[in-house]
């Protein structure tokens, strides 16, 4: 390629010189100077919206772009017309691209087996204007289409016969409207400037999500991409597609970032989804330009993709059943690395993704995240980071919203995260019920997703999506990072918490996310304080609030919360060294301070829970006789990963699940669709559960996964990130009453002696979870104090140390193995664990 690069640079110098002396040479004929007249005059449209990936749902036929790239220079009529383009010119172009020396090509070779496609011109153009293009920024995403797409083949075939190279190279403004072949729908685009390449009409970047059987020539541009250039060199552009159904994901083993250096040299523009934000990916030549591909859901065969090809072209340059998809540029949902791909299910880091995808329904959503079919998708994704994605997620039924994240119902909200129900909110993340909250993410339907995802990074709000219905999710995910609220989560049952996730104690959140039931909260998604509390309890089943909780919630207000946050931060800063040493004999002062904070969250219980259960004595006895991994609970994050639990808080990424925080995000995403909805979360849909979901990165993977509910569980799910992964997952659904069941799960988990990560967790859980006693520095102290205070369920001794707080705020100030820092942890450490009671 070095030789060809030199050749290209030499040509560019010559062309530039010609352009300087003959800038007005627009009348030069194609065969004696088309480079000057055509390429040099390529217009750059300012402020052109980026294309948003076409998402197709349902059987698709016809052309992906009005004219299939493989047909641009293939019309048979060209061979017989006097006005045929000069073949020497094409040979020159092919040689510039390093395909073959012109001396080795005949006219036929150039025209049919190796058609000059827009991608080739883009590559050539990028070599000439790469620096300028980087400054201008490229289009971001293309459109989303749902249902059978309008077939323009009749019009296109008519145009193809009349196409001349001059038409394709002429400035955009001089072309007839019928020849532009720009994407039909381009809702809402963001981007500084989009360079209009030689073939502006064929720009649709990838990232199409397809759901259902797809066939037709829409697949042709994939084919040409692989035929263009050496197949082995194109491998770097191919990342998994994420297929659900007959075709499984085939490229999960690829490292999206490993080949970026090679990709940037290849300089093939418009394969990526540009990102939206102050710093957006401008071109594939930039390091930060991941490109994604499509998500396919449903039955999808290669035979379907090749239906529109002639037999003569069916095997063009290695086209085969198992070849093209692997090398299609773009990978789908999740990625890992400093530069995160622009979308997909949930990523958090320096560069967060812009959106997610896939839409389904008879009516196309104008712009939204994705979701599917009569059975609502099993999850929603929310991502947060320094650069938060612009949109949220949506859910769909027979009728998808016309704009906005896709909403479903007779009345679609004007803009919001989508919701389901006869009446959706007019603005806001969608709510369901007779009276929906004014702003929140909850989703509801007969078949609702099994969980919600909320992710938070250094500076970003975390949303949570909760879903509820007859089939309610077993849990929700909320994660919190250095500076971000983690919230929301869903409550289900006849009685929904009246205020704010139902958290009680000094640091109760001002609002909560989504609630479902006869009584929905009036305002959700709202957080108070620079650092919003992070918690996420999800309850499913009949649940009554305690008297103390109700009284506290009636009295609390935003001002109190803000003031209490400041007071608690000051108190935490005053912790004595002696107290720190008590927490851990193995850690230094700074680490002890880190350990000082108690975890913010409690478990999420599903089903009717017996509030009277006393677990102290039973738990102690079990711990002495049982050893094993935790059965469930909330996962926690910190230097020492708790063995189980839901929410995580700390500098280090959460050990599991859909939400990832930090520089490294999970490598894959999810989102699956099918007739049957998954019984577990992170939801994958289909008759068969995915074998590997939610991939995550870390030295150690969790032994099970997020805890899924259903007859069949995925073999590996919700992966986790961090050196120490939770051994199980969290959140379970089913009737769990009485302390005995809970005791068993705890005792199985925390009596593994010699396991450093579990010692502090043992301390925390014996205290904050159910007993409310101070955390012990080690297992021996824990057992001693457990015996002494096992009957003290109210934890009054601990509460007195801080201030008068409702008895329901057990474990409010318990030491925790996890914390963010002296100052940043203070906000989260006091989140009430009592909502689980």
UniProtKB/Swiss-Prot annotation:
Location in the cell reads: Secreted
Name the residue ranges with Acidic residues bias.
584-593, 778-791
Signal peptide range in chain numbering? 1-25
Q: Which GO terms describe its biological process?
A: neuropeptide signaling pathway
Location (main, coarse): secreted
Q: Where does the record place the modification Leucine amide?
A: 190, 637
**Where, per the database record, does this protein carry Valine amide?**
57, 146, 211, 244, 276, 297, 336, 348, 360, 372, 384, 396, 408, 420, 432, 444, 456, 468, 480, 492, 504, 516, 528, 540, 606, 649, 661, 673, 685, 697, 709, 721, 733
What is the gene name? Answer: ENPP
User: Under which name does UniProt file this protein?
Assistant: Enterin neuropeptides
Superkingdom of this entry's organism? Eukaryota
Respond yes or no to whether keyword Cell membrane is given for this record. Answer: no
Instruction: State the UniProt keywords alphabetically.
Output: Amidation, Cleavage on pair of basic residues, Neuropeptide, Pyrrolidone carboxylic acid, Secreted, Signal
Q: Which residues form the propeptide?
A: 26-47, 61-134, 150-178, 194-201, 215-234, 248-266, 280-285, 301-325, 544-595, 610-627, 734-837
**What GO cellular-component annotations does this UniProt entry give?**
extracellular region
List residues modified as Pyrrolidone carboxylic acid. 641, 653, 677, 701, 713, 725
Q: Region labeled Disordered — which residues? A: 567-594, 772-837
What organism is listed for this UniProt entry?
Answer: Aplysia californica (California sea hare)
């Amino acid at each position: 390629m070095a030789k060809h690069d030199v050749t290209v640079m030499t040509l560019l110098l010559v062309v530039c010189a010609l352009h300087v002396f003959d800038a007005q040479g627009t009348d030069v004929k194609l065969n004696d100077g088309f480079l000057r007249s055509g390429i040099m005059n390529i217009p750059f449209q300012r402020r052109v919206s980026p294309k948003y990936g076409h998402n197709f749902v349902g059987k698709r036929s016809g052309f992906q772009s009005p004219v299939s790239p493989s047909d641009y220079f293939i019309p048979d009529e060209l061979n017989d017309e006097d006005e045929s383009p000069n073949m020497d010119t094409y040979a020159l172009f092919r040689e510039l691209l390093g395909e073959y020396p012109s001396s080795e090509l005949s006219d036929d070779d150039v025209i049919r087996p190796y058609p000059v496609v827009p991608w080739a011109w883009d590559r050539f153009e990028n070599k000439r204007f790469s620096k300028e293009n980087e400054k201008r920024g490229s289009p971001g995403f293309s459109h989303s289409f749902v249902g059978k797409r309008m077939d323009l083949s009749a019009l296109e075939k008519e145009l193809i016969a009349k196409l001349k190279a001059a038409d394709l190279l002429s400035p955009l403004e001089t072309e007839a409207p019928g020849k532009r072949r720009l994407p039909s729908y381009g809702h809402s685009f963001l981007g500084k400037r989009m360079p209009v390449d030689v073939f502006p009409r064929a720009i649709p970047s990838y990232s199409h999500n397809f759901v259902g059987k797809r066939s037709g020539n829409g697949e042709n541009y994939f084919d040409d991409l692989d035929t263009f250039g050496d197949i082995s060199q194109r491998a770097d552009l191919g990342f998994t597609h994420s297929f659900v159904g007959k075709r499984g994901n085939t490229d999960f083993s690829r490292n999206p970032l490993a080949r970026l250096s090679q990709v940037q040299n290849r300089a093939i523009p418009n394969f990526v989804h540009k990102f939206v934000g102050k710093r957006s990916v401008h071109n594939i030549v930039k390091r930060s330009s991941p490109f994604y591909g499509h998500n396919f859901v449903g039955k999808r065969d290669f035979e379907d993709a090749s239906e529109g090809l002639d037999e003569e072209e069916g095997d063009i340059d290695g086209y085969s059943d198992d070849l093209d998809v692997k090398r299609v540029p773009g990978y789908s949902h999740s990625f890992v690395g400093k530069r995160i791909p622009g979308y997909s299910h949930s990523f958090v880091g320096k560069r967060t993704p812009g959106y997610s995808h896939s839409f389904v329904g008879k009516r196309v959503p104008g712009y939204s995240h994705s979701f599917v079919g009569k059975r609502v998708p099993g999850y929603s994704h929310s991502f947060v980071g320094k650069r938060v994605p612009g949109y949220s997620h949506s859910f769909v039924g027979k009728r998808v919203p016309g704009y906005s994240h896709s909403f479903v119902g007779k009345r679609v909200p004007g803009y919001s995260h989508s919701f389901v129900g006869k009446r959706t909110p007019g603005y806001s993340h969608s709510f369901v019920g007779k009276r929906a909250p004014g702003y929140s993410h909850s989703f509801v339907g007969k078949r609702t997703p099994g969980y919600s995802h909320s992710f938070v990074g250094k500076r970003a709000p975390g949303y949570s999506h909760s879903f509820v219905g007859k089939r309610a999710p077993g849990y929700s995910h909320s994660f919190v990072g250095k500076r971000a609220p983690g919230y929301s989560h869903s409550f289900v049952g006849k009685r929904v918490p009246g205020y704010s996730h139902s958290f009680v104690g000094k640091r109760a959140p001002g609002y909560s996310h989504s609630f479902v039931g006869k009584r929905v909260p009036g305002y959700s998604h709202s957080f108070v304080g620079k650092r919003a509390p992070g918690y996420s309890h999800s309850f499913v089943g009949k649940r009554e609030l305690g008297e103390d909780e109700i009284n506290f919630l009636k009295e609390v207000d935003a001002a109190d919360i803000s003031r209490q946050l400041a007071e608690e931060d000051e108190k935490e800063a005053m912790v004595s060294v002696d107290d720190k040493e008590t927490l851990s004999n193995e850690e230094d002062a700074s680490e002890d301070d880190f350990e000082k904070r108690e975890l913010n969250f409690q478990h999420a219980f599903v089903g009717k829970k017996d509030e009277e259960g006393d677990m102290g004595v039973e738990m102690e006895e079990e711990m002495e006789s049982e050893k094993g991994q935790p059965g469930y609970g909330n996962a926690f994050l910190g230097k020492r990963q708790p063995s189980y639990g839901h929410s995580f808080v700390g500098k280090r990424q959460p050990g599991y699940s859909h939400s990832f925080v930090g520089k490294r995000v999970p490598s894959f995403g999810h989102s699956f669709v099918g007739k049957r909805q998954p019984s577990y979360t992170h939801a994958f849909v289909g008759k068969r559960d995915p074998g590997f979901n939610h991939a995550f990165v870390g030295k150690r993977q969790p032994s099970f996964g997020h805890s899924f509910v259903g007859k069949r569980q995925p073999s590996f799910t919700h992966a986790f990130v961090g050196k120490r992964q939770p051994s199980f997952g969290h959140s379970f659904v089913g009737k769990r009453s009485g302390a005995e069941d809970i005791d068993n799960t705890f005792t199985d988990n925390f009596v593994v002696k010699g396991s450093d990560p579990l010692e502090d967790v043992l301390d925390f859980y014996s205290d904050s979870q159910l007993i409310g006693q101070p955390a012990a520095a080690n297992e021996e102290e824990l057992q001693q104090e457990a015996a002494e205070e096992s009957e003290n369920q109210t934890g009054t001794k601990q509460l007195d140390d801080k201030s008068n707080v409702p008895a329901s705020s057990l474990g409010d100030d318990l030491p925790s193995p996890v914390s963010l820092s002296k100052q940043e942890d203070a906000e989260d450490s006091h989140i009430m664990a009592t909502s689980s009671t």
